[in-house]
From Swiss-Prot:
Lineage, broadest ranks: Bacteria, Bacillati, Bacillota, Clostridia, Eubacteriales
A single cellular component GO annotation: cytosol
Record key words, sorted: Bacterial flagellum biogenesis, Cytoplasm, Repressor, RNA-binding, Translation regulation
Organism: Syntrophomonas wolfei subsp. wolfei (strain DSM 2245B / Goettingen)
GO molecular function, one term: mRNA 5'-UTR binding
Quaternary structure (record): Homodimer; the beta-strands of each monomer intercalate to form a hydrophobic core, while the alpha-helices form wings that extend away from the core.
UniProt entry tagged with the keyword Signal: no
Compartments where found: Cytoplasm
Family: Belongs to the CsrA/RsmA family.
Full protein name: Translational regulator CsrA
Major localization listed first in the record, in broad terms: cytoplasm
Keyword RNA-binding: yes
C-alpha cells in the first residue's frame, strides 16, 4: 500500500485519467473530489460490501425467483 500525505487543495493522479483532490479536512473527516472517466466505477467500500452481502442473501432465498421470472418475461 502506498501512503501519501496531502494538504487541502492538493491532488494525486492514478494513471493518466484519474485525479483525486483533497477538498476539505475537518478533524478526522476528509472530503475528496474524484475526476475520472464515466466508465470508471467509483463507490464507497462499505456500500459495495453491503450490496455484495445483499446479493448473497438474495441468492440463498429462491422463493422470490418466480416473481422475478415473471417480471423478466415482460422485457422479452
Amino acid at each position: 500500500m502506498l501512503i501519501l500525505g496531502r494538504r487541502k487543495g492538493e491532488s494525486i493522479l492514478i494513471g493518466d485519467d484519474i485525479e483525486i483532490t483533497i477538498v476539505d479536512i475537518q478533524g478526522d473527516y476528509i472530503r475528496m473530489g474524484i475526476q475520472a472517466p464515466r466508465e470508471v466505477s467509483i463507490v464507497r467500500k462499505e456500500i459495495k460490501e453491503q450490496i455484495r452481502e445483499e446479493n448473497i442473501k438474495a441468492a440463498e432465498k429462491p422463493e422470490g425467483l418466480p416473481a422475478l421470472l415473471e417480471e423478466m418475461k415482460k422485457f422479452i
